[in-house]
From Swiss-Prot:
Pfam families the record matches: COX3
Biological classification of the source: Bacteria, Pseudomonadati, Pseudomonadota, Gammaproteobacteria, Pseudomonadales
Family: Belongs to the cytochrome c oxidase subunit 3 family.
UniProt xrefs under PROSITE patterns: COX3
CDD domains per the UniProt record, alphabetical: Ubiquinol_oxidase_III (cd02863)
NCBIfam families assigned to the protein according to its UniProt record, in alphabetical order: CyoC
Record topological domains on the Periplasmic side: 51-72, 124-143, 208-209
Name of the protein described by the UniProt record: Cytochrome bo(3) ubiquinol oxidase subunit 3
UniProt superkingdom: Bacteria
Length: 209
């Protein structure tokens, strides 16, 4: 009788260990797959950057970057996005500690910062269009709106993903699946920060000089 019980416990332990290994492998595959997606996104952004570089001087008699860019405004945008990257890092640290409430709180702060960034970007676009400097004004402005707008759409998608993730953590806790999702969103969010630094340098900083 005792041998049968012992064998049952060993079998159960083996099954639990197998399930844990399977979950670990599944999470690793998900993160690897997301890295592949980010590489395709790199190609996409590189193509749009190249297009902008070709068209930057095609102003068709309209304004150049030096005429329309407001560096102090864009610096505030940049600072907000960079701080949001730090707050997301704090959310990850909280998740590693198993602090569900702290993780959700830091994700909420990150969401608010990201929303503020998008709000400022929309305000910038509205101001330019109201001044008659919309995307149809010149090839330069068309490429500018495409590049900056595409980054903004990615940030908006990240914000939507963040809302869904906060709801999942709130209802299910910091499960292995949710931790994997947090890792993937972390890669995405930091990737967008790096892209924005490139946008700020190539488009705004070089354009304003």
């Amino acid at each position: 009788m005792s041998t049968a019980v012992l064998n049952k416990h060993l079998a159960d332990a083996h099954e639990v260990g197998h399930d844990h290994d399977h979950a670990h492998d599944s999470g690793g595959n998900t993160v690897f797959g997301f890295w592949l997606y980010l590489m395709t996104d790199c190609v996409l952004f590189a193509s749009v950057f190249a297009t902008y570089a070709v068209l930057v001087h095609h102003t068709a008699g309209g304004p150049s970057g030096k005429d329309i860019f407001e560096l102090p405004y864009v610096l505030v945008e940049t600072a907000i996005l960079l701080v949001s990257s730090c707050t997301y890092g704090l959310a990850m640290l909280s998740a590693h500690k198993g602090a569900k409430g702290q993780a959700i709180a830091w994700l909420g702060v990150t969401f608010l910062l990201g929303a503020a960034f998008i709000g400022m970007e929309i305000n910038e676009f509205h101001h330019l269009i109201a001044e008659g400097f919309g995307p149809s004004r010149s090839a330069f402005l068309s490429s500018f709106f495409t590049l900056v707008g595409m980054h903004g759409l990615h940030v908006s998608a990240g914000l939507l993903w963040m809302l869904v993730l906060m709801a999942q953590i709130w209802t299910r806790g910091l499960t292995a699946q949710n931790n994997t999702r947090m890792m993937c969103l972390s890669l995405f969010w930091h990737f967008l920060d790096i892209v924005w630094i490139c946008v700020f340098t190539v488009v705004y900083l070089m354009g304003a000089l």
